[in-house]
Amino acid sequence: MNIKPIIPFEPVASDRIPDGSEWIFQIKWDGVRVLSYFDGQEVRLFNRKLNERTRIFPELTNIKSFTNAESIILDGEVIALDSEGNPSFHEVMKRDGIRRVDRVDKVKQEVPISYMIFDIIYLDGNWIHDYPLEKRLKILHEVVQPNIFIQIVPIEKDGEVLFEVVKQHGLEGIVCKNLQSKYEIDGKNSNWMKVKNYRDVIAVIGGVTYRNGIVNSMLLGLYDKNEQLHFIGHAGTGKLTREEWVTFTRAIEPLRIDGRPFVNKPDRIKDVQWLNPILTVKVQFIEWPKGHSLRQPSIQAFVQLDPKSCLIQE
């Protein structure tokens, strides 16, 4: 491929919704960020960490089914829906977490995906990331024709109304974007802001408890800058099925250790089995009071991430 993959522009977290005619608002989909690259010869897909996903999401590689562009880079979110028709990080991770390509055909029948495109960065041999967002969106609607796998993320002008809809449907949140903003490659600034309906964290599993021989809760932690693992709470509810709990119980057998991996002593440590802290999970929570554990944590999905990158935000 003749186009070098880029690190995408990121929104900053915010607890307020901006107002003014220069702002637009979009749903924040609970999926995985994927950029599509077409250099005129081949299509390749990469995530925000520059890991290739071309063979994981083959439905998105038929570029001529939705654009006549000679070359293009698109930015969007790959999502999968749960049984109630809502975007589910747990579901999409069943696809994004595939490590054996020979399983893709089977799993793609079980977990259909959609590509929610929200930006265009490169077109017909020219970088257009310096164009204002308003102009990029106009171009995006001109060159991309939605189909069964491809959608363009809708735009709303009233952020407060959209956030109320998000809360009613239990969605992740909204993204607020300034229409005059450039697309800052490998950048992050307040021209794009994300306002979440709930909070989440990627945490490290440092121990488990069992019920009837099957793991029923995880002890979670985050590292500090000195690479010490701090206990942040227990989680035993969420989106994992019983089958996934059983599979997890078998998988952690080689990770059992005698010593506590956390620098601080967890509460309720009776009958805990400590683990070598190398597995990570995405956890949603309502609140994290200072000096206390996560409030109402809920396990969403296992995530492939370097545990040492799971850091406490100072």
Which residues does each predicted region cover?
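Catalytic cores of nucleic-acid ligases and guanylyltransferases
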Residues: 1-314
